[in-house]
């Protein structure tokens, strides 16, 4: 049985980052709403509790509070931002409006010697004070410490930026250690979870396979399962895991909607039919999808059409498999959170996700989601442990609607063919080009990155088809052809992203190859927009 950390969500958009940091320390955790019952908290039996931030204020009429059981359990508790404020209020302290709100980078001074911050600092002042570079986002502040607490950190505008009652194992910080902007944040969370809470670091993906296989076998029994295989990381790992558990009881349905990457269908079939010997039904539905997309330019309308047609094609095939009782999906934890359907009802809906829908109800099937509690990095680890090739497992993210949302405006087969080839050239050059010492000296990458491919040094890279033409010259003749945009970003969590500073020589080579090898494109541009304000995908 794994030690568990209970994360109570008060509505922060970055609560899942807390969970990711805890999992990265190889400790299992779950996110639940802050208003779960005392009985639930006791039955969960956490090794420690973490209280998240929130957009709310402790002054609102319906203040969000932690269950009383949190304080009665006798386990360590860490409050983050709003979590610190509710800890203060519930334990006898005082919170008030702050005249100096803090949003963004801040430098926090550590006070005293606490187990949480001891020895953790980013720099030392001339006076010898240890300082931390952190990320703040708050409007209220703790004005009076609760009985038994001592000051742990401060800023000029927030005199109580951290507090601790070490006798009870209660710690709280006004900043966000879970975000990458807090330089030593991961170290703080690891110390709380591993040293203060004493949780065992035994949440390891290669060991998780045995548990997951046993759970799938227990759920499914001798019944059959159908799974929509997209070629993406999530559905591929789900298929490999389920096949490991039940073998030929699984049938994978691979729908080619005409909007896949170059040679993607062949790669998927070679992997699952050839290497894993799984049952795969391959359906070429490109004519159907492209026909319904004709004349449609609105991005959301395109997404809905692609989703609707996939359901229609998948349903038709599923009905032929009359013995199937389960529908398997590659849903992962962020999908569930972003769809507002996580174990926490406080999560704000960001977008509708293509994996979370009504298919099980319309088909009358039970739902099997073996990756539902895993983050993307854990899914990748699991895939490698299952024997999937790294080039499949560590592929960059690809949207559910495929190239349909990387072709701006109307989708046509001609556009998809041009984009497929341009994108393949971009990815090939990224894979084949390694970072050099000169790149590091120019500040394009770190010294530790020298020798790594630029594909591995970017988090997501792709080409976009622009439905506009520009004038060019090739040979002695005038051309009037389409434009492609190249997009490459670097990010740790995909919530924010920086555009990748690729070497000019690499970009020049990609542009030259696309213009010379893809007849119909005569210009390539590079997108240098960050997120925010831009999103990573163009549509």
From Swiss-Prot:
GMPS ATP-PPase domain ranges (all copies): 203-395
Domain of life: Bacteria
Reactions that this protein is recorded to catalyse: XMP + L-glutamine + ATP + H2O = GMP + L-glutamate + AMP + diphosphate + 2 H(+)
SUPFAM superfamilies reported for this sequence: Adenine nucleotide alpha hydrolases-like, Class I glutamine amidotransferase-like, GMP synthetase C-terminal dimerisation domain
Active site: 81, 176, 178
Entry EC no(s): 6.3.5.2
Subunit: Homodimer.
Role according to the record: Catalyzes the synthesis of GMP from XMP.
Protein's UniProt name: GMP synthase [glutamine-hydrolyzing]
């Amino acid at each position: 049985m794994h030690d568990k950390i209970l994360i109570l969500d008060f509505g922060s958009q970055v609560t899942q980052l807390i969970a990711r940091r805890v999992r990265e320390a190889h400790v299992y955790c779950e996110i639940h709403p802050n208003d779960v019952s005392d009985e639930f908290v006791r039955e969960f039996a956490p090794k420690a509790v973490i209280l998240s931030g929130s957009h709310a204020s402790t002054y609102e009429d319906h203040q969000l509070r932690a269950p009383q059981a949190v304080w009665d359990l006798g386990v360590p508790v860490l409050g983050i931002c709003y979590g610190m404020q509710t800890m203060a209020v519930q334990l006898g302290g005082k919170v008030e409006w702050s005249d100096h709100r803090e949003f963004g980078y801040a430098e926090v001074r550590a006070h005293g010697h606490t187990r949480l911050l001891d020895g953790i600092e980013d720099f030392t002042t001339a006076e010898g004070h240890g300082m931390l570079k952190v990320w703040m986002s708050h409007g209220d502040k703790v004005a009076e410490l609760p009985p038994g607490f001592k000051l742990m950190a401060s800023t000029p505008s927030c005199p109580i930026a951290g507090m601790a009652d070490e006798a009870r194992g209660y710690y709280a910080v006004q900043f966000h250690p879970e975000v990458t902007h807090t330089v030593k944040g991961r170290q703080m969370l690891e110390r709380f979870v591993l040293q203060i809470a004493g949780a065992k670091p035994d949440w390891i993906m290669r060991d998780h396979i045995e548990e997951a296989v046993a759970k799938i076998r227990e759920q499914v029994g001798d019944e059959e399962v159908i799974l929509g295989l997209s070629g993406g990381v999530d559905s591929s790992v789900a298929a490999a895991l389920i096949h490991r558990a039940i073998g030929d009881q699984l049938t994978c349905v691979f729908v080619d909607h005409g909007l896949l990457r170059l040679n993607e269908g062949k790669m998927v079939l070679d992997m699952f039919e050839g290497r894993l010997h799984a049952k795969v039904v391959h359906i070429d539905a490109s004519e159907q999808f492209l026909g319904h997309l004709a004349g449609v330019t609105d991005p959301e309308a395109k997404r809905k059409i692609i989703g609707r047609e996939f359901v229609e094609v998948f349903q038709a095939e599923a009905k032929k498999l009359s013995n199937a009782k389960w529908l398997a999906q590659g849903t992962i934890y962020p999908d569930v959170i972003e769809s507002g359907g996580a174990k926490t009802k406080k999560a704000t809906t960001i977008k509708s996700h293509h994996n979370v829908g009504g298919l099980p109800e319309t088909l009358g099937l039970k739902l099997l989601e073996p990756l539902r509690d895993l983050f993307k990095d854990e899914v990748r680890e699991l895939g490698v442990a299952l024997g999937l090739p790294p080039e499949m497992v560590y592929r960059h993210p690809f949207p559910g609607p495929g190239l349909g949302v990387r072709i701006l405006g109307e989708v046509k087969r001609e556009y998809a063919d041009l984009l497929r080839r341009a994108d393949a050239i971009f990815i090939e050059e990224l894979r084949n080009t390694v970072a050099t010492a000169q790149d590091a000296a120019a500040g394009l990458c770190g010294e530790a990155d020298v020798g790594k491919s630029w594909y591995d040094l970017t988090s997501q890279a792709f080409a976009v088809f622009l439905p506009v033409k520009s004038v060019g010259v090739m040979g002695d003749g005038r051309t009037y052809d389409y434009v492609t945009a190249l997009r490459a970003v670097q990010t740790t969590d995909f919530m924010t992203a920086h555009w990748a500073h690729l070497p000019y020589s690499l970009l020049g080579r990609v542009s030259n190859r696309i213009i010379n090898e893809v007849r119909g494109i005569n210009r390539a541009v590079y997108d240098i927009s960050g997120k925010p304000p831009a999103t990573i995908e163009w549509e």
